[in-house]
Design a protein with these regions (language model features):
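Phosphate-rich ligand and nucleic-acid binding surfaces
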Residues: 1-332
Length: 332
């Protein structure tokens, strides 16, 4: 059975995001996509009990409705979001760039951190407002006085986020996900889901439009395989139809060309890159308990003791019987 994802529908208001917020990607190597939505007439307060309860069960501490929704969507879709107080952004601008020499930022944990020039930050027109993918800045934090919010959902280079977090001695729920790589295609959908939840709570109005800078679209991967090759790999006898059905439940689309099958890998499965990965997915759903254990097919001959080894063992035995002690040391 295919997973049922939440249906996302938003009622956009009369105000438009166009002309009120500018987004720029200065470093496309470290930021492949940056999407933003704007919420106005925001009422910051506590989130509903059901959301707080679910967050706690996931090990996340509830803070306020805006932050809780971003964390909830992160758990729901696996894609981190971040919220800014729009009125605290100088120039009403967000720029994905590398930190400047000597630049500092005070993060949400109230610690001032020294940045280096190889770290990616999200900055406004004057200063860094967020350590990209790691933690937001205190200066742009959403508080009870906030009335207009900018929601961010972006795709950052995983290795860069990992190095930044390690250098700063800082690791967050967001950075742990960015480090492994994320589905760039899910950015706008995640933004819309967050806006929908806040709107359903009656805590905001949603500005019309989305700013979406997508400089490096995610490549769609296709993996060729045959049912025979997968069965040989697994030691099974699963029909081609069953394989196609199993892959379909996992979000893979399968195309047939002559006797070769081509699996179109879902964008969120960045771990699936070659035929053995397809075989693993088939085996996982088919059931490991349904795969019979078999002995490896190989001709193994009994080894013979070499002459030099026999002489060495004999000499060792003679010397030890004569009262000598043998010391076995490391080989390096």
């Amino acid at each position: 059975q295919e997973a049922k994802l939440p249906q996302v529908e938003i009622q956009e208001g009369s105000e438009k995001i166009e002309g009120k917020l500018k987004v720029t990607i200065d470093d496309s190597e470290l930021c492949a996509r940056y999407a933003a939505r704007m919420l106005y007439n925001v009422k910051v307060g506590t989130s509903p009990f059901w959301m707080q309860q679910r967050l706690r069960k996931a090990g996340v501490r509830p803070i306020n409705n805006v932050v809780d929704v971003t964390n909830y969507v992160m758990i729901e879709f696996g894609i981190p979001l971040h919220a800014y107080d729009y009125d605290k952004l100088a120039g009403h601008e967000l720029i994905a760039r590398r930190a400047k020499k000597g630049e500092k930022i005070t993060t949400l944990d109230q610690v001032e951190r020294q940045l280096t020039e190889n770290m990616l930050v999200i900055a406004d027109a004057e200063k860094a407002s967020c350590v990209a993918g790691v933690m937001g800045g205190l200066d742009s934090e959403v508080t009870e006085e906030t009335t207009t919010v900018v929601l961010e959902c972006a795709s950052f280079k995983g290795s860069s986020i990992r190095k930044t977090g390690r250098a700063l001695g800082l690791r967050s729920e967001a950075s742990a996900r960015f480090e492994r790589g994320l589905d760039s295609e899910g950015c706008v959908h995640s933004l819309n889901r967050a806006a929908q939840l806040l709107q359903q709570m009656g805590d905001c109005e949603v500005a019309a439009g989305v700013i979406d800078e997508y400089v490096h679209p995610q490549e769609v991967r296709r993996i060729d395989f045959t049912s025979q090759r997968v069965n040989d790999f697994l030691g099974t006898d699963i029909s081609e139809e069953d394989m196609i059905s199993i892959l379909a439940t996992l979000g893979f689309k399968t195309e047939t060309h002559d006797e070769v099958l081509t699996a179109v890998v879902p964008t969120w499965r960045i771990d699936c890159t070659e035929m053995p990965d397809i075989a693993e997915e088939v085996a996982r759903i088919y059931g490991y308990e349904n795969i019979q254990s078999t002995r490896p097919l190989s001709n193994i001959s009994e080894g013979q003791e070499g002459f030099e080894h026999a002489v060495r063992e004999h000499i060792s035995s003679v010397l030890s019987r004569s009262g000598l002690n043998e010391t076995v040391t490391f080989s390096f």
